[in-house]
Amino acid sequence: MTKDMNYLFTSESVSEGHPDKVADQISDAILDEFLRQDPESKVACESFCSTGMVVVMGEVKSEAYVDIQTTVRSTINRIGYNKAEYMFDGNSCGVMSALHEQSADINRGVERGNEEEQGAGDQGMMFGYACRDTEDYMPLPLYLSHLLLRILADIRHREPELMPYLRPDAKSQFTIEYDGDTHQPVKVHTIVLSTQHDEFVPASLGRMTYAEAVKQYGQAKVDFEMQAKIRYDVETILIPRLKAALPEETARLVHSFILHVNPTGKFVIGGPHGDTGLTGRKIIVDTYGGKGAHGGGAFSGKDPSKVDRSAAYAARYIAKNLVAAGVADECLVQLAYAIGVARPVSVFVDTYGTAKNGLQDGEIAKKIGEIFDLRPAKIIDKFGLKNPIYGPTAAYGHMGRKPYTQAVTVQGQRRIVQFFGWELLDSVPAVKKAFGLS
């Protein structure tokens, strides 16, 4: 039998300082503040950020009052845009709000006398995906892309002396070589990292300002040495920390790879000053990095009555629990809804030929409806989606994150709430029982 050729697959991630992610984080911060005061809030909040300004737009139905100015500015400052030289600064940027009341036509289809029969907030299809690339059941290229940027941000926030030139904006990309027969990762093929930075003079050229160095050595020489220093730090600080954070089996894949660091040669102008940021423009980064499928609906700024968000989380939960239970090695789940209708109009499953015990995809899809209650109200209750839990989802992915509980203030009371509940594996026993798996 002829062995299939190995193949390459690539995914990217962006940092919390990427302009589109700044917009996502602003939208989810505002959503959280509405839910903190009024868990029944209906919110659809879009954000736009550019040089020196933020505009917040959308529809809201809530009893809460949210200080938009304070929420936006604190989010921007937390990310790290707190210097005038960035041309986008949480302390001085303009903040405009164009939030208005939600359409009564939409609201009457969502809210029902019987809360359990709450209708879907819109029509559409949502996808969930899981595979065995990583212990979190996520595709390896996206997992590594997220992790590299989380480590980079951690250095910038907590150990700035290690790479003191770092600015908030960054992008990463990992290309993974896969075995053509088993479809398992073989090695890391290529890493791309573009990280925004100050204009600085490396120690190799002496102690002086950038302007003085350019005058003495010429700009080409100074910029070359500057990028050489950044690359050296990536190779000796960042990549070793990445490998140390990985399980041993995965860390062994990170060797003899191609590395591109700031391949344009310079990345000083960035963030919302370099590119306009909009909510919902990084939906592939937010989900599976191009693996599986995507229904097109963004997440950030949307309360859980919007099935774009809540049903996508439910689909991920189902796919992950199916793979963890041993139903298949890879699984894609599609849920589809009609606006104002509680139950999904369809459930679709694709296991890419990896289903166990002769199970058919149609049979798996049928059983999903028996195991999981996919009405929006039940999804919301199961994952605690009326709590202010969305801020952490708005950077470094909504899927594949470690679930945890934390005390938060809701309606003036401290309570313990679940974050990333859709990543729990608490339905594995029920799935095994339903499919007769030991």
Where are these regions (language model features)?
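A short glycine-rich, hydrophobically flanked beta-strand micro-motif that places a catalytic Asp/Glu
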Residues: 41-45, 170-176, 257-261, 327-338
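Glycine-rich, mobile lid/loop segments that gate access to catalytic sites or pores
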Residues: 10, 70, 77-202, 219, ...
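Short, charge-patterned binding micro-sites
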Residues: 43-62, 339-343
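Glycine-rich anion/phosphate-binding loop at the beta-strand->alpha-helix junction
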Residues: 227-325
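Alpha-helical support elements that line or immediately flank enzyme active sites
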Residues: 16-35, 130-153, 302-326
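N-terminal, positively charged regions that mediate nucleic acid binding
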Residues: 1-44, 428, 434
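Internal helix-turn-beta structural module
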Residues: 50, 330, 338-438
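Conserved phosphate/anionic-ligand binding catalytic regions in large, soluble enzymes, centered on
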Residues: 12-14, 18-23, 118-135, 268-293, ...
